[in-house]
Amino acid sequence: MNVAQIKKVVLAFSGGLDTSVILKWLQDTYRCEVVTFTADIGQGEEVEPARAKAKQLGVREIFIDDLREEFVRDFVFPMFRANTLYEGEYLLGTSIARPLIAKRQIEIARETGADAVSHGATGKGNDQVRFELGYYALQPDIRVIAPWREWDLTSREKLLKYAEQHGIPVEMKKKEGSPYSMDANLLHISYEGRILEDPAQEPEESMWRWSVSPEKAPDSPEYLDLEFRQGDIVALDGEELSPARLLARLNELGGKHGIGRLDLVENRYVGMKSRGCYETPGGTIMLRAHRAMESITLDREVAHLKDELMPRYAELIYNGYWWSPERRMMQTMIDASQAHVNGWVRVKLYKGNVIVVGRDSKTDSLFDPHIATFEDDQGAYNQMDAAGFIKLNALRMRIAANLRNRK
């Protein structure tokens, strides 16, 4: 990229060591104006210090946006309508946050007249792909600066040395480092690196931040009633809550009961296997409850088709294709399937488990007790009809068996 061509760049900025160094590096290397953007998506950290840090480094245009409601309403909830799991386990807490950050960066670039965007993702992981696919999908002619693919600052020590040489303020706690590389938002918190790079080693109990261990969870269960409207949870125990407030509350309740811990090895889009640990207490409750709600409101073939398509949908999100035409097409179908997913589900939280103990829909239940009963159904279901059903469905197998017997 021609350095002289860049006039203004929007940087996804946390205020931490990496993005603080990137900010200064952009100013010095590209001789361009830097606009900072800091998103509050429920990571649990104060975002205002990022404003002070940006001002110290000479930034004139600073954006700090509270995106928690938009994050849950427009990204998390649509994903959960599909019961989405990547490789059967991962609830995509990191993956689903990147499209929103990319979207807002592009919006700010348009508002400020910036001709480039930049991020702090390394050249080794998935996030670089997720961010940049989003940028190009939303603004095809945008320029992208990925410092980790350009500079020679390949270690924490080199970053700290650069910061010291260029007068970049770094808090002492940042210099000391942390045991794990962590990423958090309202849906989850993730842990990577250090001891976790050995997939044979169990993580220390002290690593987990959002949940107690199941062994230390309360000895008494807790019951929750969750109300669904068109596939989304709208109320908890009779109280209507906004999407972000509801997920935050479920995180608290789930964490209290040791729910939502995951330790897995996943296949990154860039080709390598990576071990990560995750805490997704609220999401784990949501997933279990949503499947229960669908169990009595979705037609069998619709439910099975959704289950067949879900791995592909999850893969699209994991790999960064949220803004792709195929994801949008699948979302339209998924959303249409949720029109009648209305009612309530009761779950029991107990020592790491989410146990569904009740579900009902006054308006959309396909469960007919008169037909399903083991008692006298008063003629609601004619059992003699099953003979013809079975015989026709066995026809192809009978033909094949007869052929084999003649050979």
Swiss-Prot record:
PANTHER family per record: ARGININOSUCCINATE SYNTHASE
Pathway(s) annotated for this protein in UniProt: Amino-acid biosynthesis; L-arginine biosynthesis; L-arginine from L-ornithine and carbamoyl phosphate: step 2/3
UniProt xrefs under PROSITE patterns: ARGININOSUCCIN_SYN_1 (PS00564), ARGININOSUCCIN_SYN_2 (PS00565)
InterPro entries xref list: Arginosuc_syn_C (IPR048268), Arginosuc_syn_N (IPR048267), Arginosuc_synth (IPR001518), Arginosuc_synth_CS (IPR018223), Arginosuc_synth_type_1_subfam (IPR023434), AS_cat/multimer_dom_body (IPR024074), Rossmann-like_a/b/a_fold (IPR014729)
Subcellular location: Cytoplasm
Species this chain originates from: Nitrosospira multiformis (strain ATCC 25196 / NCIMB 11849 / C 71)
UniProt entry keywords in alphabetical sequence: Amino-acid biosynthesis, Arginine biosynthesis, ATP-binding, Cytoplasm, Ligase, Nucleotide-binding
Coiled coil: none
Chain residues that bind L-aspartate: 122, 126-127
Top EC class of this enzyme: ligase
UniProt xrefs under Pfam families: Arginosuc_syn_C, Arginosuc_synth
Reactions accelerated catalytically: L-citrulline + L-aspartate + ATP = 2-(N(omega)-L-arginino)succinate + AMP + diphosphate + H(+)
GO CC term, one of those recorded: cytoplasm
Binding site for L-citrulline: 90, 95, 126, 130, 181, 190, 266, 278
One of the GO BP terms on file: L-arginine biosynthetic process
EC id: 6.3.4.5
Protein name: Argininosuccinate synthase
Gene3D superfamilies: Argininosuccinate synthetase, chain A, domain 2, HUPs, Single helix bin
Transmembrane stretches, start-end: none
GO MF, one example: ATP binding
